[in-house]
């Protein structure tokens, strides 16, 4: 079976880990596995930024580190056993920004990526090269090789004027607490999905939307030209997972993002925001948490346990989605 999943960062990476657990891939593979299954992740790049002259791709790296067994288990991002000597020395020099943490081990990834970008390699090819070191057991595809950054229009606390700041500054520095007016996906007017991504969607047996942030993760992927068309054209069933349980995001600040675009923080509202593929949206199936309700025209809805407490629990989420779509593994 070919499974293609649209993902963001920490939550998306954990969802992929559960898919690997179910399919016997990556760190869950055994000598008896005969590669019957393929897992491909279409990864958000809206969080990507230039920091200290280096190209940072947080969601790609979080997926790569998580599936490769090297992620920091407490934070859910960055390297295990990280050190911070470079960050401390930069602070002594007074270098800005001082609110974005880059660990010493993590810096190596960004240095390699930046060198390859400056040598003319596309991001998809660079990601493949980086994954050679980590062996994630899945194909990780940036949604585009082009610049597609999420920026946020806020009220500047210094002069009370509206201005756009990078998503990372809004999310990390200000913790999404500034008065916020809108999101802008910079670069999407000239960007396009890679041919590898559109092929992964077209050739999939099943497509899933992970329970990542519906605005700045999945939403940023959907904003890239070519993605919606590929989803609407694929013969594969499309199964979405709610990131909202009992009116609250499982992690992160999805509620702040949803509020900005005028969508309620409920499983039903997020499902309606994605919309039915039978109409103008992208969903065939929508899974919500036990106790949550959702009615979405032309979308089949089922309630299941949705807490990704460990890979086995997440594997059962993936299994439930496949069963709902009539797919067995």
From Swiss-Prot:
Q: Which cofactor does it need?
A: Mg(2+)
Q: What class of enzyme is it?
A: transferase
Give the pathway listed in the UniProt entry for this protein: Cofactor biosynthesis; coenzyme F420 biosynthesis
Keyword Magnesium included in the entry's annotation: yes
- SUPFAM superfamilies in the record, alphabetically? CofD-like
Entry's Gene Ontology BP terms: F420-0 metabolic process
The superkingdom of the source organism is: Bacteria
Q: Which Pfam families match?
A: CofD (PF01933)
Q: What is its EC number?
A: 2.7.8.28
Named from the GO MF annotations, one term is: magnesium ion binding
Entry-linked PANTHER family: 2-PHOSPHO-L-LACTATE TRANSFERASE
- Function, as annotated: Catalyzes the transfer of the phosphoenolpyruvate moiety from enoylpyruvoyl-2-diphospho-5'-guanosine (EPPG) to 7,8-didemethyl-8-hydroxy-5-deazariboflavin (FO) with the formation of dehydro coenzyme F420-0 and GMP.
Q: What do we know about how this protein assembles, alone or with others? A: Homodimer.
By sequence similarity, the record places it as follows: Belongs to the CofD family.
Provide the protein name.
Answer: Phosphoenolpyruvate transferase
